[in-house]
A protein has these predicted regions:
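Phosphate-binding/switch region of NTP-binding enzymes
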Residues: 35-37, 41, 45-46, 74, ...
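Short alpha-helical segments that sit at the start of domains
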Residues: 239-251
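Conserved inter-motif catalytic segment of the P-loop NTP-binding fold
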Residues: 2-5, 11-12, 18-20, 24-25, ...
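Pre-Walker A (Motif I) flank of P-loop NTPase domains
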Residues: 31-34, 69
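Walker A/P-loop NTP-binding motif
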Residues: 53-60
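Single conserved hydrophobic/aromatic residue that forms the stacking wall/gate
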Residues: 250-259
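Motif I (Walker A/P-loop) of helicase-class P-loop NTPases
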Residues: 48-52
């Protein structure tokens, strides 16, 4: 295809009024493609469910405001019965703009079209969560795993950018420890390279109910959030933020009731 290169000179770019990046969760989750990775049974799905719930309600995620809007959560390793139990654990009232699906097609086999149809019906959608990434990937005979990872995530990245939404992929970590948590994301660097933001949820100790959420991305400031899992409310509560101090008032709000 003989298509000319589209370009812009620096002066024009500097003087062009461009729309700001849209944040679904202020300072944490902008529009684009993102990965939330953690070890099995670490509590990724509990965190993802709560993020979906808060976003759909337009209520804060810890100290971070949300844009509010419709949310689609593809819970591809769960049943509706399990999702119902979890919802009853974390909230007294689920919003009508939070949608769940337990089955979908795979990438390049109809998933993109399924999401497109959902977005056309629910035009106020701001967030799509896919739990897990591996469930939507078909087997590949590609001799270059990096290229395969980058190509697959590129499809979702293009979809997110086209509709100015956030797509959050729930993923796993390697079993081997690393000083840099981002290096523990399973797969090649094609995964972390294709995404706009990467989150790693890592327990402080295997038996502990505390963990650190490492956050890094193109459009956010690097931060580490110290979290504690509340076994009664079934949500991850914020203890410390490496960037901004957490107020006593905020901590008390978490201790005395549900968000």
């Amino acid at each position: 295809m003989d298509r000319p290169l589209t370009y812009m000179d620096g002066e024009t770019l500097m003087n062009t009024v461009l729309p700001p990046i849209r944040f679904v969760i202020s300072q944490l989750l902008p529009q684009g493609l993102h990965v939330l990775a953690g070890a099995p049974k670490v509590g990724k799905s509990w965190l993802a469910l709560w993020l979906c719930l808060q976003t759909a309600k337009g209520e804060p995620v810890w100290t971070f405001p949300t844009a509010g809007g419709a949310v689609l959560y593809l819970c591809l390793e769960d049943s509706y019965a399990r999702i119902q139990r979890r919802l009853l654990d974390v909230t007294d009232e689920a919003p009508e703009n939070l949608f769940f699906a337990t089955m979908s097609e795979k990438l390049r086999s109809g998933l993109e079209q399924q999401i497109e149809r959902f977005l056309s019906t629910h035009q106020d959608t701001v967030l799509v969560v896919i739990d897990t990434l591996q469930r939507i990937r078909a087997g590949s005979n590609d001799a270059n795993p990096y290229a395969s990872d980058y190509r697959d995530l590129g499809i979702l990245k293009e979809l997110a950018d086209k509709h100015q939404i956030a797509i959050l992929l729930i993923h796993h970590l390697r079993k081997m420890n690393d000083d840099d948590p981002m290096n523990m994301i399973s797969g090649t660097t094609g995964i972390s390279g294709a995404t706009d933001t990467n989150f790693v949820l890592r327990k402080d100790k295997r038996s502990a109910n505390t963990a650190t959420l490492y956050c890094t991305g193109r459009d956010i400031e690097y931060r580490e959030l110290s979290l504690e899992f509340d076994g009664i409310d079934r949500i991850w509560k914020l203890r410390e933020d490496s960037v901004e101090p957490v107020s006593y008032t905020h901590l008390r709000a978490h201790e005395t009731g549900r968000n």
